[in-house]
């Protein structure tokens, strides 16, 4: 298919898989916990740079005061150290699940518990400022999944009620919802992207055409100009086909067995399920897991 960019991306994916296998073989519990804490601390640096970036945006637009208004144009949305605002938002979702995990696993350490709460609210604030609307649903769903698998049913119920309250607030005050004026037009764009992806899948259902297939077929099927199919359910099929995805079945099965062996460690299983929740919920409207970073 002359998909040179896709071939290079496949090499990058292979390198990432090698690193993942090495990590799984050598990491221990203390290293794992250190990595989680390191990511949480790094999120503070992301936020600091993101706030600086936001004030740079204000300066460029001639705004001389802080405002909660989130601008629609990509260049006027903060992305911190990531490729764009949506990538940053998804990293915040993962960090939020990590923070909830650490909050419930830290024992008899009030200072650390307060630290996790403060960093959690900082990241929620930054999520709002990214303007990524799918992020709100993904982070709520992922945290609820974590709490269910961690057997914190009452807290999950209370958070669900809180989410309903937030939904009610935005229903009564739609102007407060980030980029509300572009909601319908953005959904129309998504529909155009998905229709193009579906036609591409039908054209090559078994093997796909490799990473970045969407960029190769968008003109042929009158798609919207973008890098991918904006769906974790469509882009893998478009790029790798049914056979390509079937190759993941043994890996998924092996990981399910690994999880079953540690079923008594509720928090660890809850962390994994929270991550899966982020991917599957955010992935309805976007495909930010493609990139190695």
Where are the model-predicted features located?
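Membrane-interface helix caps and helix-loop-helix hairpins in membrane proteins
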Residues: 1-5, 128-129, 178, 284-290
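Membrane helix-loop boundary segments at the extracytoplasmic
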Residues: 240, 270-293
């Amino acid at each position: 298919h002359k998909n040179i960019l896709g071939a290079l991306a496949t090499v990058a994916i292979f390198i990432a898989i090698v690193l993942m296998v090495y990590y799984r073989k050598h990491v221990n519990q203390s290293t794992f916990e250190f990595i989680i804490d390191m990511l949480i601390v790094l999120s503070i640096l992301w936020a600091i740079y993101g706030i600086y970036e936001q004030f740079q945006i204000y300066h460029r637009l001639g705004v001389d005061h802080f405002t909660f208004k989130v601008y629609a144009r990509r260049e006027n949305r903060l992305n911190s150290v990531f490729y764009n605002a949506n990538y940053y938002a998804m990293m915040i979702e993962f960090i939020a699940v990590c923070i909830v995990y650490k909050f419930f696993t830290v024992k008899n350490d009030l200072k650390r518990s307060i630290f996790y709460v403060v960093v959690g609210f900082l990241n929620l604030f930054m999520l709002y400022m990214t303007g990524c609307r799918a992020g709100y649903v993904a982070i709520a769903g992922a945290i609820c999944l974590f709490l269910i698998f961690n057997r914190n049913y009452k807290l999950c119920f209370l958070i669900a009620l809180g989410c309903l309250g937030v939904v009610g607030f935005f229903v009564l005050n739609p102007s407060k919802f980030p980029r509300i004026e572009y909601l319908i037009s953005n959904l129309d764009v998504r529909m155009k992207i998905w229709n193009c992806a579906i036609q591409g899948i039908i054209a090559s259902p078994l093997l796909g055409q490799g990473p970045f297939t969407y960029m190769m077929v968008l003109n042929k099927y009158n798609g919207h100009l973008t890098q991918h199919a904006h769906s974790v359910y469509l882009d893998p099929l478009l790029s790798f086909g049914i056979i390509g995805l079937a190759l993941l079945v043994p890996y998924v099965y092996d990981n399910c067995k690994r999880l079953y062996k540690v079923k008594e460690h509720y928090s660890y299983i809850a962390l994994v399920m929270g991550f899966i929740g982020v991917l599957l919920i955010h992935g309805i409207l976007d495909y930010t897991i493609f990139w190695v970073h």
